[in-house]
Amino acid sequence: MRYTKQLIDRYKRFRNTSLLRHDYHDKYAFVGIGNHSMNNLYPVLAFLHVPLKYVCCKSADKLPLIERAYAGVHATTSLQEILADEEVKGVFVSTAPQAHFAIATEVLKSGKALFIEKPPCQSLDELAQLLDLQKAHDAIVE
């Protein structure tokens, strides 16, 4: 049993070191600035050193606060601005579930990679449409 514990501990150290050494060359955007994003997702992205170029939210009042909180990040209310930026390779989406389908549709049409919180949509018909878009644009969806 002692050997198994040593092996598990060794693997955990290796995994943590590997995560810290990973260097992301691409830039990403994040849509949404709610409690779940702030408490769970942004800290993980920071820990993994994922370079965010944009944070998008509905409220223009929050834009200066976002830029002050996240150095080097451009805050915007425009998803289209993000999707037009060729430097952005992927978009993380964590908004109200009712908005997921519309945002995911635009991201997939742009050809960018998409990470979307569950549920990605609100009906089987919408899911079928998202899957068709994913195939048509050869997009990565997580």
Task: Tell me the role of every PLM-derived stretch.
Residues V31, C56, V93-S94, E117:
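Active-site-adjacent beta-strand anchor residues
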Residues M38-N39, A60, T76-L79, L124:
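Structural motif corresponding to alpha-helix initiation and N-cap regions
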Residues H74-E86:
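Short acidic low-complexity segments
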Residues G90, A96, F101-E142:
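Beta-strand-loop-alpha-helix segment that lines the small-molecule cofactor/substrate pocket
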